[in-house]
UniProtKB/Swiss-Prot annotation:
InterPro entries: UPF0231
Covalent S-S links between cysteines: none
Family membership: Belongs to the UPF0231 family.
Name of the featured protein: UPF0231 protein VF_2154
Length: 122
């Protein structure tokens, strides 16, 4: 998973560009996390709790839903999360890389640390 963070200094907005298949991670960072360091601390806490367990933690944001497990992290649009599995299978043809992303827990934690370091610089 490759990514690049940018800040538009004229507008004060942040951008997170991710490699193909992980675009939803960027949307989640910009739209749901932004500069919320309290939220980042809460996510780090749950990452530590979930490691080496089979627990799962879900966080519904304004636009996206984050699902943490010991194996993977899923970020998806709230509308997709609210669908049942059966509805999801029927609508899979509408899949869009910007709607859902999956990565490993360690990669996610590393990316989150990079985002935090980036926003703290500005």
């Amino acid at each position: 998973m490759d990514y690049e963070f940018k800040k538009n200094t004229l507008e004060g907005t942040y951008h997170a560009n991710f490699s193909m298949g992980h675009e939803a991670m960027g949307r989640w960072l910009v739209e749901d996390v932004a500069k919320n360091t309290d939220l980042l601390a809460e996510i780090y806490k749950h990452i530590a709790l979930i490691k080496n367990t089979q627990d799962e933690w879900t966080l519904s944001g304004k636009v996206m839903t984050l699902v943490l497990s010991d194996q993977e992290v899923i970020v998806q649009e709230n509308a997709l999360f609210e669908q049942s599995d059966e509805e999801f299978e029927e609508d899979i043809h509408m899949y869009d890389d910007e709607c859902i992303s999956v990565c490993g827990l360690e990669d996610f934690e590393t990316m989150l640390q990079s985002w935090e370091a980036f926003i703290n610089r500005f």
